[in-house]
């Protein structure tokens, strides 16, 4: 099977995506698939005489990509392309994807995760991993997804949606501390915990650099967990223990982080079972399929969903691979099961 691992793009999570993509490519090759990584935005330069199908015959191996400390803006990334064009799909990308039997989406954030790339693939009858275009857009939009959660009686934090016209000194219905985050962001980029009006104003200024729409949530004190769902099966939860601060971009992706991951977590069986049930319920409510990850906070008042991730990270430090490992599933088997699980869904649609 020829598999194009689509990574990169031009979101602020580009570096994380390239790390996920390189590891996925290596894993699929180790399972015998003809896999190659394609940079969505920078494209692929064909060699003389090379066809689109030949791209998958390359013997080159993908090396693990180091995640940089710096977060690139969209303008920074556009400068990386030397042909002067700014369209999302780089040179030769779409024809290569059409030549593939399957596309493994290793994209994170922006148009790679909000359903737009998925819609292009749907229109071109290209099979891909993860949720469809509508569910991807819903899951990426924190405000809409939280409204759907509340409608389905899934506990989540109180929140307000702000726009630039609301200014940086809004009147909110809940007290400090609060959490400020871009509505359609990921990897905790632009996210901060604020304790007073001055910090709120400064955080809103920063968050508006990444999104025109901002979510401000009540801060819920509790233990933080993450739980993946693969092909309808909930993985063991993993507890995230941060000793210095909170689980931000640096703690998620930098190897020097002091963050501890505990799996299986030391929690009561009924709480663990409840998180598994709510994770599956949340994905079903949002229309998500194939695989995803749901993040939680728990305390004496219950289990609260922070958010659902429709294309969770697959880097060496990412949560879903650690959860799968705790369930006895190797990284290589996890990648293969995602492809085969989505293929099964496509086959069922034909019946």
From Swiss-Prot:
InterPro entries: ATP-grasp, ATP_grasp_subdomain_1, D-Ala_lig_Van_CS, D_ala_D_ala, Dala_Dala_lig_C, Dala_Dala_lig_N, PreATP-grasp_dom_sf. This is D-alanine--D-alanine ligase. Cell wall formation. Pathway: Cell wall biogenesis; peptidoglycan biosynthesis. Belongs to the D-alanine--D-alanine ligase family. GO terms for biological process: cell wall organization; peptidoglycan biosynthetic process; regulation of cell shape. Coiled coil: none annotated. Mg(2+) 2 binds at residues 307, 309.
């Amino acid at each position: 099977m020829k598999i194009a691992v689509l990574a990169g793009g031009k979101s602020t999570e580009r570096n994380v995506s390239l790390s996920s993509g390189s590891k996925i490519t290596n894993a699929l090759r180790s399972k015998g698939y003809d896999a190659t990584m394609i940079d969505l935005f920078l494209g692929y330069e064909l060699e003389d005489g090379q066809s689109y199908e030949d791209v998958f015959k390359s013997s080159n191996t993908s090396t693990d990509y180091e995640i940089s400390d710096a977060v690139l803006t969209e303008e920074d990334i556009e400068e990386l392309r030397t042909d002067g064009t700014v369209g999302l799909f780089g040179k030769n990308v779409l024809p290569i994807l059409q030549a593939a039997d399957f596309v493994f989406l290793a994209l994170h954030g922006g148009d790679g995760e909000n359903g737009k790339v998925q819609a292009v693939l749907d229109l071109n009858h290209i099979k891909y991993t993860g949720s469809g275009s509508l569910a991807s857009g819903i899951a990426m939009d924190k405000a809409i997804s939280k409204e759907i959660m509340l409608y389905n009686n899934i506990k989540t934090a109180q929140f307000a949606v702000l726009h630039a016209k609301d200014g940086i000194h809004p009147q909110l219905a809940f007290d400090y501390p609060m959490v400020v985050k871009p509505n359609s962001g990921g990897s905790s980029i632009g996210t901060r915990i604020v304790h007073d009006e001055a910090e709120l104003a400064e955080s809103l200024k920063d968050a508006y650099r990444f999104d025109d729409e901002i979510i401000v949530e009540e801060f819920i004190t509790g233990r933080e967990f993450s739980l993946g769902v693969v092909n309808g099966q909930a993985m063991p939860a993993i507890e995230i223990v941060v000793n210095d601060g909170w689980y931000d971009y640096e703690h998620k992706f930098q190897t020097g982080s002091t963050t501890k991951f505990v799996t299986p977590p030391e929690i009561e069986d009924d709480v663990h079972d409840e998180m598994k049930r709510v994770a599956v319920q949340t994905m079903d409510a949002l229309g998500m399929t194939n695989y995803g990850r749901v993040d939680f906070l728990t305390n004496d008042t219950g289990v609260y969903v922070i958010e659902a991730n429709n294309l969770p990270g697959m880097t060496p430090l990412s949560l879903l691979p650690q959860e799968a490992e705790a369930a006895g599933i190797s990284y290589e088997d996890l990648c293969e099961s995602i492809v085969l699980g989505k293929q099964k869904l496509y086959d069922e649609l034909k019946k």
